[in-house]
């Protein structure tokens, strides 16, 4: 699936957000080798420098680490993965709340919508 980017946020931030989500969802297993910068840049159709910047962000967060010249790997540290999972969840909820506010939906109405949709899922 083609990667899509918006103009409201730096592309490397959007890439880091997407990859962070994929890591915490288990798309990339703890301890597994991560795809190369070049491979990911081709997949996302971005400059390798942009991808490198995004991956450096994930390294700073401790989600990825580099093993010499072998490449990057996903952390096996459950505390780091749990903290990242919580961050992804929190950011998602904040995004929903901002969108609801922009649409004039109160928090109570949002809760009602969620409960109603939950019944249909």
Task: Give a label for each model feature.
Residues 24, 29, 60, 66-69:
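Short glycine/serine/threonine-biased micro-segments
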Residues 33-65:
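N-terminal helix-turn-helix
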Residues 34, 66-74, 78:
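Short, Lys/Arg-rich nucleic-acid/phosphate-binding segment
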Residues 66, 85-88:
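Short amphipathic alpha-helical interaction segments
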């Amino acid at each position: 699936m083609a990667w899509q980017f918006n103009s409201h946020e730096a592309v490397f931030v959007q890439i880091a957000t997407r990859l962070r989500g994929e890591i915490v969802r288990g798309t990339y297993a703890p301890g597994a080798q991560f795809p190369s910068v070049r491979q990911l840049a081709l997949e996302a159709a971005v400059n390798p420098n942009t991808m490198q910047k995004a991956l450096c962000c994930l390294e700073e967060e401790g989600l990825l680490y580099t093993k010499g010249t072998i490449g990057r790997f996903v952390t096996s540290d459950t505390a780091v993965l749990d903290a990242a999972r919580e961050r992804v969840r929190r950011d998602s909820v904040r995004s929903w709340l901002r969108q609801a506010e922009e649409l004039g939906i109160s928090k109570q109405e949002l809760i009602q919508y969620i409960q109603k949709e939950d019944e249909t899922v």
